[in-house]
């Protein structure tokens, strides 16, 4: 009996320590609806936000502050600070060794999308190099282009996706490189006609994750991943998913 009590005490201490350490991390995100964004009251919300709150519950971590900022700023802090969690971050081949990861939040298609009325023909990705392309600065859409040898002088970077969409609709760029789901959500929220837009190329299908600064301990990331895995298998997650991605 004493041995069992001792083991239980050690287990409780370990869980408490993990929750305390998870509470020392800085949680950063961006306006990227429906995964993460601010509601009309200015509070962070979205699928990834609610998922994170469920992970905190599973790991006995008190709710933490979530800071919404431009993606490029959050990505910079992730590379420079020792205790940052940035989400939802696409886990690309180029990014994989730079950070530690807890996955998945979800999956997304990164596409080149333009106005349907424009007579663009892409038979191979290199054909897109003839056109001016917009992207969110430091976003996966921009990084995939650079990784594929695109001239950064032909990539017009915006701080936020609404700015990038405005560049497309005003004719400043021919294509946008971005997450298809997020862009179509933005198009709907701005009451634009989805039929005016066309996907000309799919760059990649990526997994969205929580990215941790590399100095964060493996044990802490594992603790977070364990909590995330439990949440993803729960009925609570099914409800969250149906809320933001309702089945037709």
Walk through the language-model features, giving the residues of each.
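Acidic, polar ligand-binding/catalytic clefts
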Residues: 53, 65-127, 140-141, 199-202
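Extended ligand-binding regions for polar small-molecule ligands
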Residues: 46-59, 139, 210-244
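Bilobed "Venus flytrap"/periplasmic-binding protein-like clamshell domains
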Residues: 33, 42-54, 116-150, 156, ...
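Short, hydrophobic alpha-helical packing/hinge segments within bilobed ligand-binding/sensory domains
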Residues: 52, 73-77, 164-167, 173, ...
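Periplasmic-binding protein-like
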Residues: 29-31, 108-111, 188-225, 247-248
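Ligand-binding clefts/hinges and TM-proximal coupling segments of bilobed small-molecule sensing domains
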Residues: 62-65, 140-156, 195-196, 228-248
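Extracytoplasmic small-molecule ligand-binding "clamshell" domains
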Residues: 20-97, 157
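N-terminal signal peptide c-region/cleavage motif recognized by signal peptidases
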Residues: 13-15
């Amino acid at each position: 009996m004493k041995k069992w009590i001792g083991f239980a005490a050690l287990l409780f201490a370990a869980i408490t320590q993990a929750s305390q350490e998870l509470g020392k991390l800085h949680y950063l995100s961006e306006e990227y609806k429906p995964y993460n964004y601010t509601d009309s009251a200015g509070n962070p919300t979205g699928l990834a936000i609610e998922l994170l709150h469920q992970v905190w519950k599973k790991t006995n971590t008190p709710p933490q502050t979530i800071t919404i900022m431009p993606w490029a700023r959050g990505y910079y802090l992730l590379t420079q600070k020792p205790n940052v969690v940035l989400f939802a971050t696409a886990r690309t081949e180029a990014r994989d060794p730079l950070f530690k990861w807890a996955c998945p939040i979800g999956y997304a298609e990164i596409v080149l999308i333009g106005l349907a009325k424009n007579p663009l023909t892409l038979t191979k990705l290199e054909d897109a190099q003839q056109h001016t392309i917009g992207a969110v600065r430091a976003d996966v859409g921009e990084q995939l282009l650079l990784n594929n040898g695109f001239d950064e002088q032909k990539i017009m970077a915006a701080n936020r996706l609404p700015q990038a969409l405005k560049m497309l609709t005003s004719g400043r760029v021919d294509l946008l490189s971005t997450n298809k789901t997020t862009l179509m959500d933005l198009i709907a929220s701005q009451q634009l006609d989805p039929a005016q837009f066309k996907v000309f190329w799919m760059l990649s299908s990526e997994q969205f994750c929580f990215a941790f600064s590399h100095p964060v301990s493996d044990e802490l990331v594992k603790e977070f991943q364990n909590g995330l895995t439990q949440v993803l298998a729960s009925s609570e997650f099914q409800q969250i998913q149906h809320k933001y991605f309702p089945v037709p």
